[in-house]
Amino acid sequence: MTIIGSMRRIDDTRGAVRVEDLYDTDIEDLWRACTEPERLARWIGEVAGDLRPGGIVRSSWTSGWSGPARIDACEPPRHLRLTSDPGTDGETQIEAWLTPEGERTRLVVEERGLPVAELPAHGAGWQAHLEDLARSLVGLPSLWEDRWNELIAAYQDADVA
C-alpha cells in the first residue's frame, strides 16, 4: 500500500499530517476545485458561508467531520489556510499550497494541531480526500470510505517523525 502522506509531532500531544499529490490539470482549475463549493462537493463535502478571508464557513465532509472553519488566508491560485473549529480544544489549521509543474499541478495539504493518537486516521483520511479530488477531475465519484478502510493500516504502521 503506497501512502502519499507523512505524520510528525509538534509537541507531546499534538501533531501534523501532510499529504501531497500531482494532478493532471492546470493550477487555475485545481484552485477552483479546492475553493468553489460546487466543486468541493464532488470530492470532500459541502461547504457554505462567508468565503472571504476572515469569513466563517460550515462544512460537512465525506469523512464525517462537520463544523465551522475560518478562512485565515486566501491567495489565489497558490495558497489557502483555514482554522477548523476555531476557539475550541479541537482547533486545527489546514493549509494548502498549489504549485504548477509543467502542465500539471502539485497540491500539498497539511493539517496541524491534531491529537498525536489521531494522526494515522487523519493521514488516511486526507489521502482518501486527495485521491477523490483526482477522481472528481475526471468525473468519477468519491470512494472515500473504501479507500480510508484500505489505507488506515498503512498509516498506523507508518512512523511519526
For every predicted segment, state its role.
Residues D24, P37, D50-L51, W65, ...:
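Alpha-helix N-cap/helix-start and coil->helix boundary motif
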Residues T25, D89, A117-P120:
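Residues at secondary-structure transition points
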Residues M1-D11, G102-R106, E111-A161:
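Terminal "cap-and-tail" regions of soluble proteins that handle hydrophobic small molecules
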